[in-house]
From Swiss-Prot:
This is Aspartic and glutamic acid-rich protein. Its main location: secreted. Residues 1-16 form the signal peptide. Component of the acid-soluble organic matrix of the aragonitic skeleton (at protein level). The lineage of its organism: Eukaryota, Metazoa, Cnidaria, Anthozoa, Hexacorallia. GO terms for cellular component: extracellular region.
Length: 522
């Protein structure tokens, strides 16, 4: 493909200007331009031919360049690298080095300290001596003497105190240390700062959370983060609710009617037992001084208690038990329906698999159709190449015919000279008459000979002009034959080849003044 593009561009750039400047009026000798000029009846016709030819060549050059540029752009795409913006690099970079450097940059106190680090890093990269690591910045990372002494506190601090006081002091000291660390982390991570907020958003997008990422994040920042991701947490709670409903459905599926009866029976027993306890307590208060009299033990019977209840209370209890039983029955039916849903999902999955198989078969049919179209295009390209070769052979045959006509003109000129010699031997009157006729015929023969030469030169010139383009057409056809899968480029090139072949069929052997201008499809 690159070779084909190079040939097209080279032909258009190297042959266009010589074709335009072919005719040189200042040339002293009898040139092809003079012969071509004499083949026209008037100067206006000759100038019209020149203008038309220059216009056709310009159109040809534009046509070739318009076809070559898209191919060039395909092979050499434009650079689409992002802008080297420092802020966007620190915030949006996803490679390991960039992300580590972003965290390292946040650890410096001010911009000057980081610039010092950046300068050392760049110098090490330029010299290629070694990699920059954390040991290069030990001096910057050193803590003040007070904090070092605070961190180096050991058992000697508590030697003079009792053991319990030592333990309490250690716990207070550890709590103070953790509080100081949290304050430092909160001070480093300001959620109102745009850079830290963008950092959290970028990490949320890439899903790279670790416990260390939220070590210094304040409670307010975490609440805002949960609000932003409320939908995700809602989805998780919905999944948990579905699991609970499935477990409840399994429990009710075992024996929902027994469950409802037992629940009702337990409630009635509890209520009856409470009434019974109240009665026994009242009786014991009345007869608490009578120690000899024994309290008869009551035997609780829920069914009898229910039968002995007043009529309105009996109806109320019956209605409540029916309502509970109906509710439990509805819940069990809903749970059973939810359990049956996986079977429907399996059927839907099988239907989707069948649809996918049908789509795959359809894609196979389309692929076979594309292969058939590619083979047909290949045959058409070969046919176009054969027609181009036939056109070139026909041009050579016309050139041979022109040479034959030139030989016939020379033969006529020789016969005229012989007639002139024979006329000199005859009488003066007849000789002069024949001499005039011979001179006239000689002039006619000379004119015919010059016209034949001009026609031959014009045909040779036209063949030279058409030969590179015919060669390009053959190469284009061969390219399409080798790469039939490039369908879009193939269709466009095939249409241009057909138009160009039609033009050459109509005008390849016509006289220059009768040739029609070459027009390309835009």
């Amino acid at each position: 493909m690159k070779v084909f593009v190079y040939l097209l561009v080279t032909f258009s750039l190297t042959n266009a200007s010589p074709l335009r400047n072919r005719f040189n009026e200042d040339h002293d000798e009898f040139s092809k331009d003079d012969m071509a000029r004499e083949s026209f009846d008037t100067e206006e016709m000759y100038n019209a031919f020149l203008n038309r030819r220059d216009s056709s060549e310009s159109q040809l050059e534009d046509h070739l360049l318009s076809h070559a540029k898209p191919l060039y752009d395909d092979f050499f795409p434009k650079d689409t690298s992002p802008d080297d913006d420092e802020d966007s690099y620190w915030l949006e970079s996803r490679n390991d080095d960039g992300y580590d450097l972003a965290k390292r940059k946040r650890g410096y106190d001010d911009e000057e300290a980081y610039d010092d680090f950046d300068e050392v890093d760049d110098r090490a990269d330029d010299e290629g001596a070694r990699d920059v690591d954390e040991s290069d910045f030990e001096e910057d990372d050193k803590l003040p003497a007070e904090e070092e002494s605070k961190n180096d506190m050991d058992e000697e601090t508590f030697e003079d105190e009792p053991e319990e006081d030592k333990e309490e002091a250690r716990e207070e000291f550890a709590e103070d240390e953790r509080a100081d660390e949290r304050e430092d982390d909160d001070a480093d991570f300001d959620f109102n700062d745009e850079e830290d907020e963008d950092e959290v958003d970028n990490k949320a997008e890439s899903d790279i959370f670790t416990p260390e990422d939220f070590a210094g994040v304040s409670d307010e920042a975490m609440d805002n983060f949960r609000d932003d991701n409320e939908e995700e947490y809602a989805d998780e709670s919905d999944d948990e609710a579905e699991e609970d409903s499935e477990e409840t459905a399994d429990d009710f599926e075992d024996d929902p009617e027994d469950e409802s009866d037992e629940t009702f029976r337990d409630e009635v027993e509890d209520e009856s037992e409470e009434n019974y306890q109240d009665d026994t307590e009242e009786g014991s208060e009345i007869k608490q001084n009578d120690e000899t009299e024994e309290q008869p033990e009551k035997k609780f019977d829920a069914d009898k208690e229910h039968e002995d209840a007043p009529e309105p209370l009996k109806e109320k209890l019956s209605d409540e038990s029916k309502a509970r039983a109906e509710d439990e029955s509805d819940k069990s039916e809903d749970a059973a329906k939810e359990i049956k849903e996986p079977e429907d999902a399996v059927e839907d999955f099988e239907d989707g698999a069948k649809v996918s198989e049908d789509e795959a078969e359809l894609l196979d049919d389309e692929a076979e159709l594309s292969d058939d179209e590619a083979e047909l295009s290949k045959d058409e390209a070969e046919q176009s190449s054969d027609e181009a070769e036939k056109s070139e052979d026909k041009a050579e045959k016309s050139e041979d015919e022109a040479e034959l006509s030139e030989d016939e003109a020379k033969q006529s000129e020789d016969e005229a000279e012989k007639a002139e010699d024979a006329a000199g031997k005859e009488s003066n009157d007849e000789g002069k008459k024949r001499e005039d006729e011979a001179v006239k015929s000689k002039g006619i023969a000379r004119d015919e000979s010059e016209f034949a030469k001009a026609k031959k030169s014009n045909l040779a010139l036209k063949r030279d002009e058409n030969r590179p383009l015919a060669k390009g057409l053959r190469e284009s056809a061969a390219h399409l034959r080798d790469f039939p899968s490039e369908k879009k480029s193939k269709d466009a090139a095939q249409g241009n080849i057909e138009n160009e072949l039609d033009y050459f069929k109509r005008n390849a052997f016509a006289d220059s003044k009768d040739a029609e201008p070459y027009e390309f499809d835009k």
